[in-house]
Amino acid sequence: AHARRLAAEGALVAVNDRVASPALDELAHEIGGLPVPADMADREAVFAGLDRASEHLGDVDIVVANHAYMSMSDFLDHDEDDWWRVIDTNLGGTFWLIQAALPSMRRRGAGRVVIISSEWGQVGWPRATAYSASKAGLISLTKTLGRELAREHIIVNAIAPGVTDTPQLQVDADAAGVTLAAMHEEYAATIPLGRIGVPEDIAAAVAFLADFRMEALVGQVVSVNGGSTRTRA
């Protein structure tokens, strides 16, 4: 949804997934963009991907760090490999992605970085220890880089989505032994807006934060969750 929204507003978009696939190629073709498969936990792959994007599309001036890896288990069941896979992908991958894109933004004299964190990075979530910690780290990265890069007109902000209607929700429903409709209803009951999010909600926020006419919002976290965090202590 983010890629389609930015392309519709005139951006040349490089789209990423961990591995090459027909679906990635089809999306890139649909929006007139470029498929750039790369494992975001691999620093060399991230830098190579940015080089490929720059070679084909020109200097990068907008980065949307939307990649994520999640696992859920009781705290004592998180093993070392699982912990580092989550941290290296979510937090490390974003760190490398911004490092790789920064020279392009400096050449252009401006840039926009939109980091996709999570509501769980703000409030935490049981059994999602590594994921929540990684997403909280992204919020700190946003605030720090926001302060560091703003004078160069490179503006860094984050989005913290709440529960959103993606394929992961079906996985969660199956794991809980309930129907998808029941899970929608359960989550919606806790959200002041009365519904869970949809990808287009997040895409609209991405487009806003990527807009070069908007510069005074720096190092902020935009909570796109229908007001759900306002219902918690």
Task: Set out the residue ranges of the language-model regions.
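Short C-terminal tail/terminal secondary-structure segment
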Residues: 123, 207, 218-233
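Substrate-binding pocket helix/loop in short-chain dehydrogenase/reductase
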Residues: 74-75, 79-87, 183, 187
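Active-site loop-to-helix junction immediately N-terminal to the catalytic Tyr of the SDR YXXXK motif
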Residues: 78, 124-132, 144, 172
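Residue(s) in the substrate-gating loop at a strand-loop-helix junction
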Residues: 118
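Active-site helix of classical SDR
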Residues: 98, 134, 142
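Canonical Rossmann dinucleotide-binding motif of NAD(H)/NADP(H)-dependent dehydrogenases/reductases
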Residues: 1-14
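Alpha-helical segment proximal to the catalytic Tyr-Lys
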Residues: 103, 147-151, 215
